[in-house]
Amino acid sequence: MTKSRPPAVNPKNFTSMKTKYFFALIIAAPLAFTACNSEVPKEKAAAVASAAQQVYVPPGKLDDYYAFLSGGQSGGVFVYGIPSCRYIREIPIFEPRAGLGYANNLGTESYKRLRDSGPIWGDTHHPVLSQTDGKYDGKNLWINDKANGRVARVDLHTFDVAEIKRVPNIQGAHGLAAYLPSCKYVFVNGELEHDFEKNTTDPANYRSVIAFLDGQTLETKFEVSFVGNADIASSGKDGKYVFVTMYNTENGQSSEGMIERDRDAVGAIDVPLAEKLVAEGKATVINGVPVIDETKIPGVLTRIPVPKNPHGCNVTPDGKYVLASGKLSPTVTIIDAHTLKVVAEPEVGLGPLHSTFDNRGNVYTSLFVDSQIVKWNLEKAIKGDPSYLVDRVDVHYNVGHTKAAGADTSYPSGDWLISLNKLSKGMFLPVGPAMPESQELIDISGDKMKVVAAFPSPPEPHDAVMVSRQVLADKVAQTYQLPAKATKLGEEKVVRNGKKLEVFMTCIRSKFIPESFEVHQGDEVTIHLTNVETVRDMTHGLAIANHGINLACDPGQSQDATFTAGKPGTYWYYCTWFCSALHLEMRGRMLVKNDGEPVSDSLNPGAVPANVEPKASYE
């Protein structure tokens, strides 16, 4: 059944329709769309078989793309293979993951980095990949923490977190993008306005900031402050402007107050001008960061009026235009990225949220209310050609972000698109009142879009980015390079300093060295574990019974754990990652003694000599 187009909307007379579209948005229930014409079973079977063939990647073969999906309230990033939609791994960032030994033990570098940056939890929304010459380069991934005003950098050489930094003066670090073409900055939008200068509760003092961070160190270099909220971010391609959608120019403190005006804006920040103002000392230093107040220094931020409460902000691959999705308007506003003039405002459907691109001049916009992806031609829309709408496909259900492969670069691939849906409503086996998140893979290589797969994920991906295997796979490390602090085979030792004990330990199939050590009850124990394996994927773990300790140590890696020894007795430690036929035998003892009892600082105290047969009794 072909869906009718939404009624025409004159942006100048948007007021009369604001209630209709606003309430259509907030109460829209996900609908399953069924075809009116019954399909011939053979044709349907052939279509299903064709889709299955497209996404099938045989065991032992590799996917064409890495897909990085933000984890939302799970606090990390999920990695999938495309087109198979196979879950590959999670990159934990703002939340501990005991199974991966991430930030779950005192003493680990990941715990210290996370603790020093703020709360032990985060809300990740927008993954961003580094680029060189308009193409992904496979070096870095950046991600925001909306809840706690932080940004993290992941080193894609190891898929490890390299940096986490708190951004001063910001609440709701939401939209995130890399400043192009250099990536010398990543910039992040402060969505939640507040008084960051005087710390009052008076809304008259509320402001938000857009912060520019060094792309490597994540140190905040400067900020631009303004009244209102900044939502999604995107960069021009020539180093001049970066763009953000801005809503709540009313400075309202309730949902009703935030939608009173018929027009909000896209903000264009002149980055070279901002740098010049900072260099000339015209910014005010607030909480250690130069802040440019755009209300006092004109020109650094230009507001381009668009329909109220815009959401998505996307720059086209050629850098000519920036698109602002209407959300409460059934339109997408097309803005010249150089003149900052609106050139068109085509209607696309109900609840447009985000747009992405192929390599043939087409735009794909997610429609939250319609539960669709709509394909439309950019140049035709600009010229006013009524045939600009090309295709629509139903998704399941209530899509938020959508992202095509390579769409953030100057060279999109034009083959695959992911629809990140907000509700699944029976798409998967029931697992309780809450259902898994639903993502769908869409083939966009032809004239017509085709949904070829649906796959669940943990909660809750907001955005995604896809990079070719050819760009990244060969750059990923086989093993870690042993750091200088690493304990080498034959250098294991126990060092005691009063009530503090350090154990310098190695692990290799299938043995911990030492296999025992002695401590007093209440001692502060730090284990420095080094995996001396040289073979990829030979990970070892270290769990200590009844002490809540689990380390994960990849080949060539060192990890530390600090804890307090419990009551007297024997506590076994063992390897938590299956590594060999003698995996169960890969264990040792922590011998905890009462204060005053003698303890040994030698390796393997209390061990039974290998040539002595232990006593045993059998029934």
Predicted regions: what is each one?
Residues P11-F23:
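Bacterial N-terminal signal peptides that target proteins for export
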Residues A24-A32:
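Bacterial N-terminal signal peptides
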Residues C36-K493, T562:
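Predominantly soluble domains enriched in secretory-pathway, periplasmic, or organellar proteins
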Residues V79-G81, P514-V535, S558-K567, Y571, ...:
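Beta-strand cores of secreted/periplasmic/IMS beta-sandwich domains, seen most often
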Residues E163-I164, H528-S558, A581-R589:
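Histidine- and aromatic-enriched segments that form or immediately flank copper-ligand environments
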Residues L301-T302, A344, P514-F517, G548-C553, ...:
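Beta-strand-rich interaction surfaces with strong enrichment in secreted/lumenal proteins
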Residues L489-E492, C553-E619:
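Extracellular/periplasmic metallocenter environments
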Residues V494-E524:
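N-terminal edge beta-strand
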